Regions:
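Cap/insert and terminal regions of metallo-dependent hydrolase folds
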Residues: 25-114
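Core dinuclear metal-dependent hydrolase active-site scaffold
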Residues: 1-24
Length: 114
């Protein structure tokens, strides 16, 4: 059964929301701008897809930065970390493919999810 679940994810903004989308394939999470790119949730990523579909190498964040990289503008850092953990729990698995972020090019390049 395909369902939508809304979750409050404050931190970047007071009214931030994430949407869990249950599909036949599994549970995707539409994150909006919390986080705005997958590297925020997965700071050890070493590749990213750019517009047009090319995969490019990127430098992973230093491990001592912690489990997440926060957006540049955060109204509440504690709420932000709580929301990142909530977002991770909403997905099928802790893998970037399950997170549709607001500014990731692979989300623009892909035509169908689930």
């Amino acid at each position: 059964m395909e369902t939508l679940t809304l979750a409050k994810v404050p931190g970047h903004t007071l009214g931030g929301m994430a949407i869990q989308v249950q599909t036949a394939e599994g549970k995707y999470v539409i994150t909006g701008d919390m986080p705005h790119i997958a590297q925020s949730l997965f700071p050890q990523m070493n590749k990213m897809e750019v517009i047009g579909g090319e995969i490019v190498d990127i430098t992973p964040a230093p491990e001592n930065w912690g489990p997440f990289i926060l957006n540049s503008v955060i109204y509440n850092h504690y709420a932000c970390y709580d929301s990142f953990n909530k977002i991770m729990a909403l997905a099928e698995a802790e893998d970037p493919k399950w997170f549709l972020t607001g500014h990731d090019m692979w989300c623009v390049n892909k035509r169908y999810f689930g």
